């Protein structure tokens, strides 16, 4: 059998290796989450026309395109830089929260550089809080967005049966679904970041105890 000190060193080596592998996967999935967040923010496919809608078209957070009359040609309007052009105050609020989520997760990626200068555990915990805040912003954005479905522009596309949280003849599109999936992603990543941060704290404590026993 191996001496206790050697067994402890082997365990610690495997522990560090596994933590690093999980940390790399966490960083990769954080980057993918950032891409998803950006796509959800910029793509205008949150809701769209259906078989029975009066007009063709689709809506995003701030950009939307609607047909006119019998023509299938779409007229597009709306820009985040022109906040007043967004057709509903609910859409404006949703745009703000989804935009904040995007900024937070991109800032989290920027914090990866801190791994070279700061305690690994501290960086993980900072990123964990950022990801949790990003997930919270996504929740708020996704919950507020349907409150704007009673806007005149949405009713023109989806029919008079459209109202707050009632989509009428339209349907939910992929960008909205992706944003909802992003909430779960953010929660899992933030939980993993806190776990990794606490594991790093535990590893540092073990190293300090090992140094003390070695000196003794």
From Swiss-Prot:
Membrane disposition: Multi-pass membrane protein
A Pfam family per the record: L_HMGIC_fpl
Keyword field: Membrane, Transmembrane, Transmembrane helix
Transmembrane stretches, start-end: 22-42, 96-116, 126-146, 177-197
Locations listed in the record: Membrane
GO CC aspect terms: plasma membrane
InterPro entries: LHFPL
GO biological process: sensory perception of sound
UniProt record similarity statement: Belongs to the LHFP family.
Name of this protein: LHFPL tetraspan subfamily member 3 protein
Organism name: Danio rerio (Zebrafish)
Gene: lhfpl3
């Amino acid at each position: 059998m191996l001496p206790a000190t050697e067994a402890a060193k082997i365990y610690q080596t495997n522990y560090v290796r596994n933590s690093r592998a999980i940390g790399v996967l966490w960083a990769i999935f954080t980057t993918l989450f950032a891409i998803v967040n950006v796509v959800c923010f910029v793509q205008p496919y949150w809701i769209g026309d259906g078989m029975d809608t009066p007009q063709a078209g689709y809506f995003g957070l701030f950009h939307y395109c609607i047909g006119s009359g019998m023509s299938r040609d779409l007229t597009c309007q709306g820009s985040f830089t022109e906040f007043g052009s967004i057709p509903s105050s609910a859409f404006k609020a949703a745009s703000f929260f989804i935009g904040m989520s995007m900024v937070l997760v991109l800032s989290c990626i920027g914090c990866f550089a801190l791994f070279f200068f700061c305690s690994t555990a501290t960086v993980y915990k900072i990123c964990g809080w950022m990801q949790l805040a990003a997930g919270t912003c996504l929740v708020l954005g996704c919950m507020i967005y349907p409150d704007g479905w009673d806007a005149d522009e949405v009713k023109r596309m989806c029919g008079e049966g459209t109202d707050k949280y009632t989509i009428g003849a339209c349907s939910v599109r992929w960008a909205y679904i992706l944003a909802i999936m992003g909430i779960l992603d953010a929660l899992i990543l933030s939980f993993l970041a806190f776990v990794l941060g606490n594991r790093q704290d535990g590893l540092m404590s073990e190293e300090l105890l090992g140094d003390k026993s070695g000196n003794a």
